[in-house]
Amino acid sequence: TGLGASVISGNNVIATEIGNTNLGLSALKSLLKINSDEFNVLEDVISGTGISRMFETNTGNKVKSEEIFSLSLNGDDDAIEVIDMFTIAFARTLSDLSLAFSSGGGIILAGSLSRSFLTIANKDLFNKHFLDGKSDIHKEILNKVGIKVANRGYTCLFGSLNYINSI
């Protein structure tokens, strides 16, 4: 329903509520030319609700993110613009998180939004913004970060079950 992040270090999992922070939000809003007070935390941009909200801000039409994905696949210019905005925001945020947490082991994306996004993502745009604004040494680090998508649904439940079985 939003944006969460966890860091795995050894046998420890550190969960965060990164989506409810405004870390980097001002820079994203400026880059994406979002001039609305409706975007106050990261998940107001980087989530299914965020995609819908950006579409509504741009067009005046309230549409679910799933339909925006479909419209994008069918060549709708407004939907493509919003998916590109999401792609840029997602790439920049993952890049910053990768550097903040030294994601040498890579990034695993989970959730239906990540799975749906993978099918329509402009990978060149993502890669450009994943590295954009970074120094050469940091680009070198980021180029080594693998990004994968967990294609299995309900991954959070499997994680919870694994935790319960360990206590």
Predicted regions and their residues:
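Phosphate-binding/catalytic loop of phosphoryl-transfer enzymes
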Residues: T1-E38, S160-I167
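ATP-binding/phosphotransfer module of carbohydrate and carboxylate kinases, centering on a glycine-rich
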Residues: L31-I167
